Amino acid sequence: MAAVCQVTGATPGFGHSISHSHRRTKRRFDPNIQKKTYYVPSLRRNVTLTLSAKGIKVIDARGIEAVVKDLLARGEKI
């Protein structure tokens, strides 16, 4: 599963793990990605989205209908 949020577009960040002796090793900071299923009344079906924790909060605030409308407008496959 790709570590990209469908709503916010959050992608992994890159940086270093720094040990006690300050040796730096490359690492990846992944967003908190979850698969969530929502029922969308206008489509009359369930929609499964790959979301970050912030993306889930956006859906809670704006509503699934508004978010799905935006996703369809920008050509996202649902």
Curated annotation (Swiss-Prot):
It comes from the Bacteria. SUPFAM superfamilies: L28p-like. One of its GO terms (biological process) is translation. Pfam families: Ribosomal_L28. Disulfide bonds: none annotated. It comes from Leifsonia xyli subsp. xyli (strain CTCB07). GO terms for molecular function: structural constituent of ribosome. Belongs to the bacterial ribosomal protein bL28 family. GO terms for cellular component: ribonucleoprotein complex; ribosome. Keywords: Ribonucleoprotein, Ribosomal protein. This is Large ribosomal subunit protein bL28. NCBIfam families: L28 (TIGR00009). Gene3D superfamilies: Ribosomal protein L28/L24 (2.30.170.40). Transmembrane segments: none annotated.
